[in-house]
Amino acid sequence: EKKNLWLHVDACVGGYIAPFVRMNGADIPPFDFKISAVKSISADLYKYGYCAKGASTVLFRDQTLYQYMIFDCDNWPGGRMITPTLAGTRPGGAISAAWAVMNYLGVAGYREKQKQVTDARQAVEQGVTQLGFDILGSPQLGIVAFSHPTLDVYAIYQKMFAKGWFSGLTTEPKALHLMLSPFHMSVIHTYLEDLAASIEQVKAGETGTVGEVRYS
């Protein structure tokens, strides 16, 4: 605010879960328009909004700021072209589907879905801690990462992959990385059983190699 800079919040993953987790009683730190310097927020509907891919949102503090998003060009032979974004023609199916999902779930539906997510995350945290893993940071929403103080996490991942579990990995530090959904609560018990078995395999000397691909 002192520098009169536009502060944008990239809430593409957490934007449609954090407000409802807060409504459910969790102490979620301010990240949104509660902070006076925040001018805009992006949040993907296809993640924790549970909508089809192809629909996302950008929110502005007030209507006057929206003008800076509009693409307005007349420096070409086709005449003046104005679109809400840099993109031209976009299919409306994903937008219509998002409208239907959001109206169907409503605030109560989203609160229930996000409670299922945080319940699943807490169950994972408890289970992996009992297996000797260390939780990275202090998860509050639907993502959790955990490392092991003595075992090769990538070797454990390889064993889990062979059992049909396709999760993410982090590199610094090495950790298993999960993005949980309401469905996952029903499979956590099986996941933890397979994780325990994978640990025993690695302890017994069954190791392998895991290639590295970075997302940027």
Annotated model-derived regions:
Residues 11-15, 47, 173, 182-184:
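Active-site-proximal loop/turn and secondary-structure-junction residues that shape catalytic pockets
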Residues 1-3:
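Active-site core of PLP-dependent enzymes with the aminotransferase class I/II
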Residues 111-114, 118-125, 129-131, 137, ...:
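Non-catalytic terminal extensions of PLP-dependent enzymes
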